[in-house]
Amino acid sequence: MPDDLLNSFMTGPDEKGRFGDFGGRFVSETLMPLILELEQQYEHAKTDDSFWAEMQDLWTHYVGRPSPLYFAKRLTERLGGAKIYLKRDELNHTGAHKINNVLGQIILARRMGKTRIIAETGAGQHGVATATVCAKFGLKCIVYMGATDVERQAPNVFRMKLLGAEVVPVTSGRGTLKDAMNDALRDWVTNVRDTFYCIGTVAGPHPYPAMVRDFQAIIGKETRDQMMAAEGRLPDTLIAAIGGGSNAMGLFFPFLDDKSVNIIGVEAGGHGVNEKMEHCASLTGGRPGVLHGNRTYLLQDEDGQILEGHSISAGLDYPGIGPEHAWLHEIGRAQYVSITDREALDAFQLSCETEGIIPALEPSHALAHVCKIAPDMPRDHLLVMNMCGRGDKDIFTVARALGWDMDGA
């Protein structure tokens, strides 16, 4: 990567919400006033000490932050090579990184006088986090979830309902995250007066990509401090799984200007990155286009129609990527690779067997890439992987994929 590309990689987006050629706000006239109001509210909140004091109090006493930075000793010994640390965001309240961001958005929603919260969800973790925070603050919660994901993420559907949320199965398209987001946007257009759309990833129209990144950046900030305390220096490599890319952006962002730190995002390779598009690796196998209010890399056909893609992981089953990731890819600051379903399943089992940690299928993709590269690294190479979610929600999917009979277990 050329040293003279930029003075800083942390100044974006610009006033139009763009990261280079990516991002922006491609929304209907009905939504534009709400988007501009949200941007104004967030710009004010960013410099409001009372906002961040409330966030820090909730992160500490409700979420349970800071999450540990854990040296995976047996995994390191099994693989040889790099010294592997796991950022344990699966230990957060609700079991994933999603609640870091949801708290911030719902505090903003309350400041804006909104009483009805809508959200999209794939793996269900963002839906659970949104339902959780809505229950805490007494807000109405509606979660849009693809019908396919409702079936494969049944435990999280039940959790959302227990928390008082209305779960709306989306049957259009292939019934996955893209379709859930489409229906959530349609709801928002219809109910702009009292409704706040709590987006779960670093995608969507500006200011969402930057706002979600800023709320998730607590992951990387903690990691910097914890690594300095544990090793006396910064990590050499960061690795995180990428669907829309919020957990990865949260880990990566505080390190973007540290050019000694290698950054790797891991996309869902599905059945393999090929012309059949049986994957969700939009950076590896897609091209630029516009979806859900922003310009980014997408899986699309020759006519620009969005393709469905595939991943065993509901949280990575999205045919796009956050615009800041698209920009980092194009300028060469971060590297993006893909991992197949099979490789992720193998890594899922390895984590269980070596560390006693049942990972979600999303970070299992990141772990699979760790398994590929760690053995060839020197023993003093410090590698940090974000364990962004726990695998309780995925045990039935994994059992089916491995041919295990859960009824006879």
UniProtKB/Swiss-Prot annotation:
GO cellular component: cytoplasm
Pathway it works in: Amino-acid biosynthesis; L-tryptophan biosynthesis; L-tryptophan from chorismate: step 5/5
Record CDD domains: Trp-synth_B
Any Pfam family the entry gives: PALP
Cofactor(s) needed for function: pyridoxal 5'-phosphate
Top-level enzyme category: lyase
InterPro entries: Trp_synth_b_CS (IPR006653), Trp_synth_beta (IPR006654), Trp_synth_beta/beta-like (IPR023026), TrpB-like_PALP (IPR001926), TrpB-like_PALP_sf (IPR036052)
N6-(pyridoxal phosphate)lysine PTM positions: K98
Catalytic activity annotation: (1S,2R)-1-C-(indol-3-yl)glycerol 3-phosphate + L-serine = D-glyceraldehyde 3-phosphate + L-tryptophan + H2O
Enzyme Commission number(s): 4.2.1.20
Gene3D superfamilies tied to this protein: 3.40.50.1100
GO molecular function: tryptophan synthase activity
Keyword annotations from UniProtKB, A to Z: Amino-acid biosynthesis, Aromatic amino acid biosynthesis, Lyase, Pyridoxal phosphate, Tryptophan biosynthesis
Superkingdom as given in the UniProt entry: Bacteria
Assembly and binders: Tetramer of two alpha and two beta chains.
HAMAP family: Trp_synth_beta (MF_00133)
Similarity remark: Belongs to the TrpB family.
Record function comment: The beta subunit is responsible for the synthesis of L-tryptophan from indole and L-serine.
NCBIfam families per record: trpB
Protein name as it appears in the record: Tryptophan synthase beta chain
Annotated organism of origin: Jannaschia sp. (strain CCS1)
Gene name per UniProt: trpB
